[in-house]
Amino acid sequence: MQERFSAVLLVGAGGFAGASARYLIAVALSSFATGFPMATMLVNVLGCFLIGMISELSLTTSLLPSELRLLLATGFCGGFTTFSSYMYEISALLKDGELFYASLYLIGSLVGGMVFLYLGMALARVWS
């Protein structure tokens, strides 16, 4: 139980730092607003770089213990962007030769995300 609680604290601390970093980047780039979501794109691409580096280092070397991976990959990157997790999971499926599941996850998440975004918006309009 103690180990699980420690893991939750690590993920929470990393998530706080990641979400805060995302907000600060959005604030810093707000003066360059052009209608294009530059901050979101930057965060998503940077998050992919970070989760790729963190995961590779923790899986192939002893440089990052599992606790640090929880803090950085699950916590920080998870709070920073879930897009990085999405891309990493697709790459893991491809690495395992699961082209069908990788494609299903890629397309299903994009299409499903848009469909449910509009469903949520429609439901909110009904309530308002």
Swiss-Prot record:
Keyword DNA damage: no
InterPro entries, per the entry: FluC
Topology in the lipid bilayer: Multi-pass membrane protein
One annotated GO biological process: cellular detoxification of fluoride
A Pfam family recorded for this sequence: CRCB
Keywords from the UniProt entry: Cell inner membrane, Cell membrane, Ion channel, Ion transport, Membrane, Metal-binding, Sodium, Transmembrane, Transmembrane helix, Transport
GO cellular component, one term: plasma membrane
Reaction equations catalysed: fluoride(in) = fluoride(out)
Purpose of the protein: Fluoride-specific ion channel. Important for reducing fluoride concentration in the cell, thus reducing its toxicity.
Similarity annotation: Belongs to the fluoride channel Fluc/FEX (TC 1.A.43) family.
HAMAP family, A to Z: FluC
NCBIfam families the UniProt entry points to: crcB
UniProt protein name: Fluoride-specific ion channel FluC
